[in-house]
Amino acid sequence: MQLFTSFSLLAVASFASAHGIVTDISSGNDWWTLSNPFRDPYMNPVPDRVGWSFFGAGNGPVPDFTTKDIVCNQFAKPGKLSATIAAGSDLTFYWTVWPESHKGPVLTYLANCNGDCSQVQDPSTLSYFKIDHAGLEDGVWVSDKIIANNNSWTVKIPSDIAPGNYLVRHELLALHSAGQDLGAQFYPVCINFKITGSGNAKPAGVTFPGAYKRTDPGILVNIYNGIKSYIIPGPAPYVEGGSPGNSAEPQPQHTSTAVSTAKTASTSSLTTSVTITSQAPSNTANPPQSITTTTTPKPQSTNINPTSLKTVTTSLRREQLINLCLDDINRQIAAAQPKNGGPVNFSNIEKKREDCYKI
């Protein structure tokens, strides 16, 4: 029991400081908790979820977005349940605390499973059409807006979509290392849905891998040179009564729906009640009225550990050094986890995580 408790604290601490996952989703009065790679594998029995599991992947990015991992994350297995939602409804995604340095766009897709989504063994065989995206608008990254809105983002399910079983694919793309090949960091999650309604639209889609290219201007990009515009990867979102097309500037603006106070409070208590160190970012139930963005020096490496931090140039901000350190911790956590659960001793990793905050 002590091992599980220690590990749980380590996992949540890493959530609060580097990278992230979607923990919950909601629509109206309905709320669903998704699969958690740091918790669910160690529960007996392992709970059935509407979200696809990715045990062993941790909360870090997909290592190579040109592989099938880009669809639903590494080691992805279909959720055994499906959530029901009406076409035209809002759907809110609740992320763990997102690092301010991980600036980039948010993207959401739908794919018809052509049957029970829990029976889909290879999600790369499905066709995905985009229903929402947002990137850089008036100098503000959408990732900053997500942070300000208690680490949540709301999209609308198109009202004219034909009813059926759909996979919702939602992701954040972090661009802090995107100036180098394969440096863009994708954080995808897949969720099973049964969409109800009377629509008949069946938009054409794209496939993953393949929809994103290594040299796409929104993927291989230096965000530290004062860019004024940004081309979001993938196709343009489907418009009710219309059809998706190629993504090009100017990007359509996203109208975000505010998260209710009750749900915000629930998410806030989940992320703040287990914060271990004072340096870790904390969630807030009162988002700031204005958002400011800062131009920060580009991290010079994403492969670092606490013992080598003293050799890193001092031109980096302290929070960037902490992020680099925690990147390495996340990789160690993922490597230490057995794919199918089981006891693990994380004491050494916990010590290294504590050292990250002593920089």
Swiss-Prot record:
Q: List the disulfide bonds.
A: 72-190, 113-117
Gene Ontology biological process: cellulose catabolic process
The catalytic activity of this protein is classed by the Enzyme Commission as 1.14.99.56
Which reactions appear under catalytic activity for this entry? [(1->4)-beta-D-glucosyl]n+m + reduced acceptor + O2 = 4-dehydro-beta-D-glucosyl-[(1->4)-beta-D-glucosyl]n-1 + [(1->4)-beta-D-glucosyl]m + acceptor + H2O
Cofactor(s) in the UniProt record:
Cu(2+)
UniProt-recorded Gene Ontology molecular function terms: metal ion binding; monooxygenase activity
Q: Which UniProt keywords apply?
A: Carbohydrate metabolism, Cellulose degradation, Copper, Disulfide bond, Glycoprotein, Metal-binding, Monooxygenase, Oxidoreductase, Polysaccharide degradation, Secreted, Signal
List ligand-binding residues for Cu(2+). Answer: 19, 102, 187
> Is this entry keyworded Signal?
yes
Please indicate which superkingdom the organism of origin belongs to.
Answer: Eukaryota
Q: Positions of the region Disordered?
A: 241-310
Cellular component GO terms, alphabetical: extracellular region
Q: Where is the composition biased (Low complexity)?
A: 255-304
Q: Which CDD domains match?
A: LPMO_AA9
Residues that bind O2, according to the entry? 176, 185
The free-text biotechnology note states:
Lignocellulose is the most abundant polymeric composite on Earth and is a recalcitrant but promising renewable substrate for industrial biotechnology applications. Together with cellobiose dehydrogenases (CDHs) an enzymatic system capable of oxidative cellulose cleavage is formed, which increases the efficiency of cellulases and put LPMOs at focus of biofuel research.
Principal cellular location given in the protein's record: secreted
Subcellular location as annotated: Secreted
Q: How is the cofactor bound?
A: Binds 1 copper ion per subunit.
Q: Where is the composition biased (Polar residues)?
A: 245-254
Attached carbohydrates are found at 150, 345
State the protein's purpose. Lytic polysaccharide monooxygenase (LPMO) that depolymerizes crystalline and amorphous polysaccharides via the oxidation of scissile alpha- or beta-(1-4)-glycosidic bonds, yielding C1 and C4 oxidation products. Catalysis by LPMOs requires the reduction of the active-site copper from Cu(II) to Cu(I) by a reducing agent and H(2)O(2) or O(2) as a cosubstrate. Active on cellulose and on xyloglucan for deconstruction of plant biomass.
Q: What is this protein called?
A: AA9 family lytic polysaccharide monooxygenase B
Q: Which gene produces this protein?
A: LPMO9B
